Amino acid sequence: MSDSYREQHKLRLAYMPWLYPRLKPRHRAWAEPWQKKVQEELERLETVRFGEHCFVAPQARLFAEPGRDIRVGDHSHIAADTVLHGPIRLGAHVSINHHATLEGGAAGIEIGDHSRIAAYATLYAFNHGREAGDLIREQPVTSRGIRIGRDVWLGARCGIVDGVTVGDHAVVAMGAVVTRDVPPWSVVAGNPARPIGRRPGAPPEEGGER
């Protein structure tokens, strides 16, 4: 394999990290040492810890000062041009696609196992005061945290504001702005996001028809 081909292959993986676990043995022979080096360097520079069989693009930006650590669960993937600022906890088999932004504020972001965060999604776990009479930049910052459940899909360019919990198995549509909690199995869309249905085959809602 030529050096130029390998570099192109690395770039493809950086933007499409779901291809990493599908690599053929001859590609895995160079990709695994490469990833080991990338992850060890991040762990040396920041308070970041990776589980087993993770992928992180060299172009990803992870910032985790002491007290704002980032934990990445087994088999999770972080694509290129993402920005993650702790505190953040990613479960196992979590995928963060390119250009997503996760800002943990003080209270942090937690994402459950098997959840998918699509390209350009934005999660901000803090908010500014906005009282009239004072400059916004001089007002206190608050942080309640963001909780994303298990098997959740956050669509491309959606936004999740501070204090929101997205329940297990929920779907947030492309471009939605989520300002309140999302029940499990719900599908929400719009700005502000509102329920538009439930995932096909979802169990009945509690208290609903049986």
Model regions and ranges:
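Terminal amphipathic alpha-helical/low-complexity segments used for targeting or macromolecular assembly
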Residues: 1-53, 114, 120-121, 125-133, ...
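Flexible, glycine/small-residue-enriched loop-and-beta-strand segment within the central core
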Residues: 58-72, 77-165, 191-192, 198-208
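A generic "structured core" feature
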Residues: 161, 171-177
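Short, functionally important structural connectors and interaction interfaces within domains
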Residues: 34, 40-42, 52, 62-64, ...
